[in-house]
Swiss-Prot record:
The gene is rpmG. NCBIfam families: PRK00504.1 (NF001764), PRK00595.1 (NF001860), rpmG_bact (TIGR01023). One of its GO terms (biological process) is translation. It comes from Streptococcus gordonii (strain Challis / ATCC 35105 / BCRC 15272 / CH1 / DL1 / V288). The keyword Transferase does not apply. This is Large ribosomal subunit protein bL33. Belongs to the bacterial ribosomal protein bL33 family. InterPro entries: Ribosomal_bL33 (IPR001705), Ribosomal_bL33_CS (IPR018264), Ribosomal_bL33_sf (IPR038584), Ribosomal_zn-bd (IPR011332). HAMAP family: Ribosomal_bL33. PROSITE patterns: RIBOSOMAL_L33. One of its GO terms (cellular component) is cytoplasm. Keywords: Ribonucleoprotein, Ribosomal protein. GO terms for molecular function: structural constituent of ribosome.
């Protein structure tokens, strides 16, 4: 079962990216490296509820 999630950068508070994940395969919070236009570099974005 796939669910839609929002990715947030904790330090800047940006919530830029929407993606989906399979809850059965990845029960933990997802962390992905994405580009932050505010900081102009790649940073870690974490799943928020």
């Amino acid at each position: 079962m796939r669910v839609n999630i929002t990715l947030e950068h904790k330090e800047s508070g940006e919530r830029l990216y929407l993606t989906s994940k399979n809850k059965r395969n990845t029960p933990d919070r997802l962390q992905l490296k994405k580009y932050s236009p505010k900081l102009r570099k790649h940073v870690v974005f974490t799943e928020v509820k």
